[in-house]
Amino acid sequence: ISLLIGEEGNPLSSQEVLEGGESLILSEVAEPPAQMIDSLTTLFKTIKPVKRAFICSIKENEEAQPNLLIGIEADGDIEEIIQVAGSVATDTLPGDEPIDICQVKKGEKGISHFITEHIAPFYERRWGGFLRDFKQNRII
């Protein structure tokens, strides 16, 4: 609420950087919110730098209430993508539970590793027809 009435601007831009060594509990979401996923998929189709997007749940300890975490893999600076995705996610999520959004990079450790290696993306940019043939035939 303080972010809504404060002078800082956009309440969606609250950022918290976790120090290395802090542990988080990540898990797959059994039934992701369909309307939010559909809206984010539609959005990401219009933003070329977005390669893939994932959703999982995150909590700080066993007793904590889990939050949804949206991981976005994209080329370049993704601050603006995170802002737009946050707006769409909060507008389409039933209820008003918090949503976390982070950038994921293939090959990085920590949250990025868990998400890219253990969670199936709900959005993946389509390959061009020529490249799609290569991917399907395992040529690349």
What residue ranges belong to the model's regions?
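A contiguous, surface-oriented mixed alpha/beta subdomain in the mid-to-C-terminal portion of proteins
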Residues: 2-119, 123
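A cross-taxonomic marker for long C-terminal extensions/tails that follow the last structured domain
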Residues: 126-140
